[in-house]
Amino acid sequence: TEREISIVTGTGVCKALRKKGHNAILVDIFCGLEPVDWDEPFGDKDYEVDSAAEYMRSFDDAIEEIKRTRRSFFGPNVLELCQAADIVFMGLHGSNGEDGKVQATFDLLGIRYTGTGYLSSALAMDKGLTKKIFLMDQVPTPKGVSMLKENCTRNIHDLGMEFPVVVKTCCGGSSVGVYIVN
């Protein structure tokens, strides 16, 4: 899942940063972190990255319920920890990390973060729009068409294409909803 990829990414980055001497911790954007030792919010030398990752995974079965029943997108202490950090490494994958919403929130709150800004993230999340922008600037892209379900043709030859084709949802993450149709 995109959540698991995010946890794996964050774990690897956190370990690398800590190995280089940085005070880094893993924070689950949805479930947050409770309690927080505000005297040492970014962990001491004995901070266990793998234990933090397992703690995050412990919410996997309940994550949709947690998101549905809560008033805020962000879990407890997430924004406060991000504001206290020198910089936030964005390890989120999928719609919640790549669509520009988190980046826009961070921009509004003055939180420094890695990666692209909110506008480029939002534009790139829509693969059809991204393709149009690339084509306008003569960036080579594979042949493709965008269509809505209600306008979908059942005859691939009407589109000037032949099998096999790659079918991708327009606004999913980079590898979500990808199918090869023969």
Residue ranges and their predicted role:
Residues S6, P142-S146, P164-N182:
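Glycine-rich phosphate-binding loop of ATP-grasp-fold ATP-dependent ligases
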Residues T1-L119, L123-M125, L129, M136, ...:
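ATP-binding N-terminal substructure of ATP-dependent carboxylate-amine bond-forming enzymes
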Residues D158-G160:
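Acidic (Asp/Glu)-rich catalytic clusters
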Residues I133-T141:
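Basic phosphate/pyrophosphate-binding loop/patch that engages nucleotide-derived ligands
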Residues K20-H22, P140, S174:
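Residue-level signal for beta-strand positions within conserved beta-sheet cores that form or flank
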Residues A84-I87, F163, V167:
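Generic hydrophobic-segment detector
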